[in-house]
Amino acid sequence: MQYVVVIGGGHAGVEAAAASARLGVETLLVTNNVMNIGEMSCNPAIGGIGKGNVVKEVDAMGGVMALAIDRASIHSRMLNRSKGAAVWGPRAQADRKLYKCAVLELLTKYEKLSILEDHITDLIIENDRLMGVVGEKTGTIKCSAAVLTTGTFLNGIIQTGSERVEGGRFGEKASQCLGNTLRRHFKISRLRTGTPARLYKDSINYSALVEQPGDSPPIPFSYMNTEITVPQVSCYITHTNGKTHEIIRNSLKFSAIRNGVSARGPRYCPSIEDKVVRFAEKDSHQIFLEPEGLDSELVYPNGISNSLPKEIQEEFIRSIAGLEKASVARYAYTIEYDYIDPRELRSTLESKRVKNLYFAGQINGTTGYEEAAGQGIVAGSNAAGAGLIISRSEGYIGVMIDDLITLGTNGEPYRLFTSRAEYRLNLRSDNADFRLTEKAYRVGLVDEERYAAYKKKYDTFHNYKSKLNELSTTPYELAKIEGISIAQDGVRKSAWNLITQPLFVFEDLLRIWPELSEVPEKYREMLTINARYEPYLLRQEQDVKLLRNNEKVVIPSNFDFGAIKSLSSEVIEKLEAVRPETLAQAKRISGVTPAAIVSILIHLRRLGAEGSQPFPKDLDQALRQLN
């Protein structure tokens, strides 16, 4: 009989346990504290650029996160809305209490899922096969598979200035016994992350801040929801200043992360100490003041995580506009913890060393709630025997897992970005259900209700698309309509052809074919996005094939990687350090993504690089859309 044990009740553990239970397998979720299931340990928000796509992918496969945030969303925004849909990033601020309540309520509806409050101290491994786990209070628990989603708890050390305590999170003890067990079986390294202080709301001078309202109406994350019913509130923006930076610079010798903590933190979510040192030329850094809940007295100051002593935290916080009289409810800290080398995992997230043992979340070297959830749904599904593998072309979850198991983390927490995906034109936040719901349904992750909703949406979309392809007119007829300009080439054009053009909007089609007014607003946007991207998706596939044929392209010794705007600072830093001689060498550098290689190839081709093969006609123009 199958019996899956999930260790840890964070975002990875929640999705792993829910996925296993949805597949009809008896599942046990073991957590240190039932009331902390779904806890947002750091910022009270879900989503963002790249991250929001993962949440939509988890939802497309029947997951929990999107449903939970829709019940707790108090401030919703679509990031990058002014850019192409491929880089849109849905994001929502959460009411912490509402989010945890929603997660727990959703989990309790699974008949096959039980929850146990205990500390897992050991693993039972025989002949390189997991046979069970050992609980501090429960003792031996036999199982067919287990998923480790321990977050920052493995040998966690919390530091604020010179204060150093063992802990997996504020107020919770670390998992030392389990951490020591893993050290006997796996290659273990250390990472760190941090969190800022929490401030009392009534001590903040909001008149000195810039208000940032959310989108109206707020857009749900889940494909199963049509609206957000939770009251909405604003966030606020302020900035550090010269005085703030001076206080921090003069106090670096007291910072834990500058003195003694050797583990590396997240590159793209640096502490304020790192910002002041790494970006010394900057006069200020932006801070978002995010409410922790509708009835919470606390505010999360996003952008000033640190490990400075408490008195220095108060001093630099009060040097910031609007925070001159700020009262600290809880001080910032950094936490150092164990993680495994994810290159020792299969694409199912099963260990190569120990059969039936799966890993998901920060234990794999990632950072972020969303990355954890994406790994959790894959690990939990496969622990239950689903055989679920998501490819790089199917989802950001596939990009992330492939990056982890082939490249590793390069010693720093892994964060997902749209730039990591060579297929990003298709991996959009608007089409995750079209990409993954059918696949998830086939393995049993998606129930009949969700699948029926997906099929209705899919069929409706394609019916409307067919109608747009059937309707056609001539440039001559279009010229008679005021405000519509099109080349008089004599070629008959369908409504679908017209909407592919950037200057055409769906409302223009209504002036030509009034009968299209029956198309609902959400389908108008879907049709427009798909029409605009369709020609480039075909060329994107050509681009990926071309890349495989250009691995021997020579990279000049004086090539300026920094001139390629689409490359991240992380990738540029690694390329400059190694100075690869060919594209093949560049591909083997840990952290240099396939998307980055594509960008390099484009620029090399324009320079007439030695060994590069000719691009198909018009491909240069198409590839520019990827950068």
Swiss-Prot record:
SMART domains linked: GIDA_assoc_3
GO cellular component terms, A-Z: cytoplasm
GO MF annotations, alphabetized: flavin adenine dinucleotide binding
Major site of localization recorded for this protein: cytoplasm
InterPro entries the UniProt entry points to: FAD/NAD-bd_sf, GIDA_C_N, MnmG, MnmG-rel, MnmG-rel_CS, MnmG_C, MnmG_C_subdom, MnmG_C_subdom_sf
Entry-linked PROSITE patterns: GIDA_1 (PS01280)
Gene3D superfamilies named among the record's database cross-references: FAD/NAD(P)-binding domain (3.50.50.60), GidA associated domain, C-terminal subdomain (1.10.150.570)
Cofactor(s) the record lists: FAD
Keyword list, A-Z: Cytoplasm, FAD, Flavoprotein, NAD, tRNA processing
UniProt-annotated binding residues for FAD: G8, G9, G10, H11, A12, G13, I120, S175, Q362
SUPFAM superfamilies reported in the protein's UniProt record: FAD/NAD(P)-binding domain
NAD recorded as keyword: yes
UniProt binding sites for NAD(+): 265-279
Subcellular location: Cytoplasm
Family classification: Belongs to the MnmG family.
Subunit structure: Homodimer. Heterotetramer of two MnmE and two MnmG subunits.
Protein's job: NAD-binding protein involved in the addition of a carboxymethylaminomethyl (cmnm) group at the wobble position (U34) of certain tRNAs, forming tRNA-cmnm(5)s(2)U34.
Listed HAMAP family: MnmG_GidA
Protein name: tRNA uridine 5-carboxymethylaminomethyl modification enzyme MnmG
Organism: Neorickettsia sennetsu (strain ATCC VR-367 / Miyayama)
This protein's encoding gene: mnmG
